[in-house]
């Protein structure tokens, strides 16, 4: 009986140990996801503050200064205000489409962050088709905008949704062709492999120098995908009031506001990964890989800092562009996408393919 009781206790303790391991395993699954979401939220708050400060500097006026030191908490105050506002719904609108549209726009952009390498193998999902996964997921966002415009039962909202869909289709193709050129140079569709391929040759190995035409096209297409000036036709204030956002209020309006900055941040991160060497420091006699070998935590921190520094450099260019260039007409926007960017990006892809074939 003593042996039997001991065996039962051993089995029970083993079962408890296994259940504890499962619980800890589940916790450790959510830790990186929570860390990524927290970092994204912080990044968006910083972008909002930067945009207000930069726009104030360009327009020679005082920016936000009351909410926190230097107005750094202004975005948080605005978000809190929208959170407690009433959610209004159009009486004759399509309620399911009206409610689901903002969520689709935000979730599709959030999923794209899973393939971004912030440092050496510090990526939520290192997939072999990571770059194409981003393109596929980001193509879902305009569907949410179109649903929002149609579900609002408002002519301005519907026209804004149609413009968003047309603009996305027009600039998604040149952007994809530029990504194909990068994948040919790197012989991979993984974002980690693309960064490592650029780190072999240091600063001059960046795809910025190997693909200057593709970089310019990707830059323009990214701004158009983010619907930033001079490409903000879907929500042109003078023509469409607020476009597909016209009938929204409260937290749903705030979701569109967040989605635009999430899209801007993810576009800047992909510019860094594809063209600016990612976490690679690219300074002679200083190798980021040596830092990882000496101290992994220090090397990872340095890699994150380098990635974010390059990202916010591109963000500064995007914000400055918004406040310096006039808005295009709809026909000019479509002509630019279909008649100029598409043929040039296709020619760039064919040229890259030819060079790769001759170099074999």
Swiss-Prot record:
Keywords: Chloroplast, Membrane, NAD, NADP, Plastid, Plastoquinone, Quinone, Thylakoid, Translocase, Transmembrane, Transmembrane helix. GO terms for cellular component: chloroplast; chloroplast thylakoid membrane. It is an enzyme of class 7 (translocase). It catalyses: a plastoquinone + NADH + (n+1) H(+)(in) = a plastoquinol + NAD(+) + n H(+)(out); a plastoquinone + NADPH + (n+1) H(+)(in) = a plastoquinol + NADP(+) + n H(+)(out). The chain crosses the membrane at residues 27-47, 98-118, 129-149, 165-185, 203-223, 253-273, 297-317, 340-360. GO terms for molecular function: oxidoreductase activity, acting on NAD(P)H; oxidoreductase activity, acting on NAD(P)H, quinone or similar compound as acceptor; quinone binding. It is a multi-pass membrane protein. GO terms for biological process: photosynthesis; photosynthesis, light reaction. Its main location: plastid. NDH is composed of at least 16 different subunits, 5 of which are encoded in the nucleus. NDH shuttles electrons from NAD(P)H:plastoquinone, via FMN and iron-sulfur (Fe-S) centers, to quinones in the photosynthetic chain and possibly in a chloroplast respiratory chain. The immediate electron acceptor for the enzyme in this species is believed to be plastoquinone. Couples the redox reaction to proton translocation, and thus conserves the redox energy in a proton gradient. This is NAD(P)H-quinone oxidoreductase subunit 1, chloroplastic.
């Amino acid at each position: 009986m003593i042996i039997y009781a001991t065996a039962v206790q051993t089995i029970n303790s083993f079962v408890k140990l296994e259940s504890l391991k499962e619980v800890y395993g589940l916790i450790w699954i959510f830790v990186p996801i929570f860390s990524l979401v927290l970092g994204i939220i912080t990044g968006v708050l910083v972008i909002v503050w930067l945009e207000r400060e930069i726009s104030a500097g360009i327009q020679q006026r005082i920016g936000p200064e009351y909410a926190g030191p230097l107005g750094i908490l202004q975005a948080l105050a605005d978000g809190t205000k929208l959170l407690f506002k009433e959610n209004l719904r159009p009486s004759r609108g399509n309620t399911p489409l009206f409610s689901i549209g903002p969520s689709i726009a935000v979730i599709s952009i959030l999923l794209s962050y899973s393939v971004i390498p912030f440092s050496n193998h510090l990526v939520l999902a290192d997939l072999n088709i990571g770059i194409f996964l981003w393109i596929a997921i980001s193509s879902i966002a305009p569907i949410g905008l179109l649903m929002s415009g149609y579900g609002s039962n408002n002519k301005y909202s519907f026209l804004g949704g149609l413009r968003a869909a047309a603009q996305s289709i027009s600039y998604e193709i040149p952007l994809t062709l530029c990504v194909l050129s990068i994948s040919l140079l790197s012989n991979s569709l993984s974002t980690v492999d693309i960064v490592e391929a650029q780190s072999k040759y240091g600063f001059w190995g960046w795809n910025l120098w190997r693909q200057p035409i593709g970089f310019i096209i990707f830059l323009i297409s990214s701004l158009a995908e983010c619907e930033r000036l001079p490409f903000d036709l879907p929500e042109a204030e003078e023509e469409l009031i607020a476009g597909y956002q016209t009938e929204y209020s409260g937290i749903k309006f705030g979701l569109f506001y967040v989605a635009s900055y999430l899209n801007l941040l993810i576009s800047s991160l992909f510019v860094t990964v594809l063209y600016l060497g990612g976490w690679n420091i690219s300074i002679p006699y200083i190798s980021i890989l040596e830092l990882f070998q000496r101290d992994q935590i220090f090397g990872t921190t340095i890699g994150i800092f380098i990635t974010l520094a390059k990202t916010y450099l591109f963000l500064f260019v995007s914000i400055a562009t918004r406040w310096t260039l006039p808005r295009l007409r709809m026909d000019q926007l479509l002509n630019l996408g279909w008649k100029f960017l598409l043929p040039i990006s296709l020619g760039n892809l064919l040229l890259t393919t030819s060079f790769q074939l001759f170099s074999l």
